């Protein structure tokens, strides 16, 4: 479904820089630029693509659109109150940096916060993520990436409402949705994937990238790094003719 009525952006206050000024390195306004710089060096957010958002109680901090990720600073960060977003056609910001635009990823980040109570959501344009979606195009099941019996799977939780992490022998499943011309139009399909696969912490976007979330910045970052590792392993396995799903029996 194409976006026909763009969301109206409103700023409540003209002087709200106090929301992004902090000496604490763990403050969201400091963490987001640091994360984006790290992701840029990994090749995940090339050419201003991708983004990150952190929720701290009711405040949501968002990376802007169009800023080189390795050059991002705290003053570039948008801030909104998640409880003030009552009209889907209007997004109210507590802080909007001058001469910048909000990220088109914003409604997808908000879906992770409202539907999964996430503390952080990351969007990358990782080449490995894109390659996985391309490999799946010619597979019998094109809408699900599945892999098991790889140690790094242990980095993922069992599900939003479950305790503990997946084990070595468990199968990690990441749904795939089709890309759309406009990023915000992905929102309804991301939400559908969340509803259909409630245990997932990520959604792949065909020929585009991946969205990954977690209950904290640490968890989201850990899962994003682990997922990229697994995507790369899976691409190399495909080259060698090795299956992503294998029947490895547990050692007694």
Curated annotation (Swiss-Prot):
Its cofactor is Zn(2+). Keywords: Amino-acid biosynthesis, Cytoplasm, Lyase, Metal-binding, Methionine biosynthesis, Zinc. Pathway: Amino-acid biosynthesis; L-methionine biosynthesis via salvage pathway; L-methionine from S-methyl-5-thio-alpha-D-ribose 1-phosphate: step 2/6. Zn(2+) binds at residues 123, 125, 208. Substrate binds at residue 105. It is found in: Cytoplasm. Binds 1 zinc ion per subunit. The active site is at residue 151. One of its GO terms (molecular function) is zinc ion binding. The keyword Cytoplasm applies. This is Methylthioribulose-1-phosphate dehydratase. It comes from Sclerotinia sclerotiorum (strain ATCC 18683 / 1980 / Ss-1) (White mold).
